[in-house]
Curated annotation (Swiss-Prot):
The lineage of its organism: Eukaryota, Viridiplantae, Streptophyta, Embryophyta, Tracheophyta. The keyword Transcription regulation does not apply. One of its GO terms (molecular function) is UDP-glucuronate 4-epimerase activity. NAD(+) binds at residues 98-129. The chain crosses the membrane at residues 30-50, 96-116. This is UDP-glucuronate 4-epimerase 4. Optimum pH is 7.5. Active from pH 6.8 to 8.2. The keyword 4Fe-4S does not apply. It comes from Arabidopsis thaliana (Mouse-ear cress).
Amino acid sequence: MSRLDDIPSSPGKFKMEKSSYLHRLRFQSSLTKFAFFSFFLLCLISLLFLRSPPSINPSSPSDPSRRSLRTNTYGGPAWEKRLRSSARIRTSTNNGITVLVTGAAGFVGTHVSAALKRRGDGVIGLDNFNDYYDPSLKRARRALLERSGIFIVEGDINDVELLRKLFKIVSFTHVMHLAAQAGVRYAMENPSSYVHSNIAGFVNLLEICKSVNPQPAIVWASSSSVYGLNTKVPFSEKDKTDQPASLYAATKKAGEEIAHTYNHIYGLSLTGLRFFTVYGPWGRPDMAYFFFTKDILKGKSISIFESANHGTVARDFTYIDDIVKGCLAALDTAEKSTGSGGKKRGPAQLRVFNLGNTSPVPVSDLVRILERQLKVKAKKNLIKMPRNGDVPFTHANISLAQRELGYKPTTDLQTGLKKFVRWYLSYYSGDKKAAAR
């Protein structure tokens, strides 16, 4: 018998014993009422469920903002041991850094993480493995990194508790922030995912960084899309960026303004990198060079955009290895943040750089190179560029990055696509070992 049963209903007073028959009647009546109300409640819940519209349309891609905060298991001695091992600096020099790479299972994140590890830096990856594109490709990238001793934590930049835990266990000197909702056209289908990842996620990360001691220096991925509807080329960091052509571009522009705010108020050292059409092995399936390759091999027709009056659409295609060199140079030249305890103690570094190839190539030329590499003739369909956020021309002025980062791209499109095609054929033929080379 529970000790609670010994306590009288009115302490200090005599409790009159009730008739057992009356007790049974009331008990049966209570059961009847309970059954009735349970049935009523069940019917009400069923009705509400049937009348509620589905939160995600099954015929369209699911919302990454809903997927990314799913519960993941983290914590515990074994988990913390893996973190510390991955974060350990293994270089003989005294200038090694410890970096948190967000979006580490993404295209650029994978290559940057691997390059940092190769030179002996400590690296922890963070990725939510959402299904904006095939998650199996992201997991293959993770397997590649883990063979090099890099631990990729499965989690989201909007998970504040996870971020706090990571910074509590590891004293990061730098953050390489590459996590984002990518893609210009997808923003028309799922706009909320861009605000969730590219704005809210960035703010969450900066909030954690400003509160830790010491504060890390932060390098983050902006985008060439911030130049929007500018017609003056090549694009320079001094040009206006107040006419974004897509929601994606607007969120990246917002990120630059947010960075300025946190630099000004909290003394965070921040460097933004405006990437220009990155391509190469382990790339993103939503990029034109990638799905062109897939469709050409399958004998499907590919659509090539034309700008107004049958004008040429061209991109400043930049090979992944050149982008990685720029990222590492930005990390190496980043000055320390000046804040402490969430308060600014002095002026802090704030920079933005273009990372491009400086040689725009018409998309039609890209297709011709792919045809030669694949030894397959493409079925081409020329169509007018839709108003979906794409712009007809991109061209980077990289003089600032050359001067301050020593940035010098060396890979032309033909050489880069040859490497991509070799990787693509190896990976999708099932030869993962050859693809990893």
